[in-house]
Amino acid sequence: MSQPPLLDHATQTMANGSKSFATAAKLFDPATRRSVLMLYTWCRHCDDVIDDQTHGFASEAAAEEEATQRLARLRTLTLAAFEGAEMQDPAFAAFQEVALTHGITPRMALDHLDGFAMDVAQTRYVTFEDTLRYCYHVAGVVGLMMARVMGVRDERVLDRACDLGLAFQLTNIARDIIDDAAIDRCYLPAEWLQDAGLTPENYAARENRAALARVAERLIDAAEPYYISSQAGLHDLPPRCAWAIATARSVYREIGIKVKAAGGSAWDRRQHTSKGEKIAMLMAAPGQVIRAKTTRVTPRPAGLWQRPV
């Protein structure tokens, strides 16, 4: 039997957009997997619309809109989805289903869109705190929404989900420094660039790769406490959800390890995990879940960045 069109669209979106997460997503039970795919579809669509990688809307005129106008339309359609309006776009129909089913709040969705607003405004990040704030909007709040899909309502567990999103995004930033620079985006703290003898104007130059590698290493090291904190969140997830998240956590963390190990050559090719490595992590993840579920959960470290409440 073929999949329903909406699910088929969501499945293809995940396959095209995130090979790192696609493997882990297969581990969810069917109902949770459907909701995860639906949520991812909306996130991916919003990202593509802001970057003008897809028209995103039925009218050809939409492709000519300025980014600020595209962002405003995304906000309007997102709020309409919450209000129960009939959604013609598959991405918003998918989001409407998952948001209304799992109690995702308008604030969560709008917080995510605020991250795209930071890109539209070409926000510059001076401190690591500034970078973490961006990471919250584009990934930490996605962790919150994904956790709600998995049945999480405890604020302490949601904190751990947010931590994993922060860790994922810090890893993404380190991996994609040069690709982002090519489209005039820099998420690295200017203070860290200065510490390495770099500037926002010259950090991406090939002759500065050794110094840039030190900044990337610092970023990967900064992600580690958030990866560690997120481990405790597995304790309260349903078993198959915990298995999927533990796998995704291992895959993304390994990408950071590869970036760090490659040094100045980290951006000569896109750092990734092989199919064999993903399978090995998938098989090792149940052990992580068992440890998390049989270990007393300690309080979240006070020094970690705290999401807005």
Swiss-Prot record:
E.C. numbers: 2.5.1.-
Molecular function (Gene Ontology), one example: geranylgeranyl diphosphate synthase activity
Keyword entries, A-Z: Carotenoid biosynthesis, Magnesium, Manganese, Metal-binding, Transferase
Cofactor: binding comment: ATP is required for the transferase activity but it does not seem to be hydrolyzed during the reaction.
Transferase keyword on record: yes
Spans through the membrane: none
GO BP: any one term: carotenoid biosynthetic process
Function: Involved in the biosynthesis of carotenoids. Catalyzes the condensation of two molecules of geranylgeranyl diphosphate (GGPP) to give prephytoene diphosphate (PPPP) and the subsequent rearrangement of the cyclopropylcarbinyl intermediate to yield phytoene.
UniProt name for this protein: Phytoene synthase
Lineage: Bacteria, Pseudomonadati, Pseudomonadota, Gammaproteobacteria, Enterobacterales
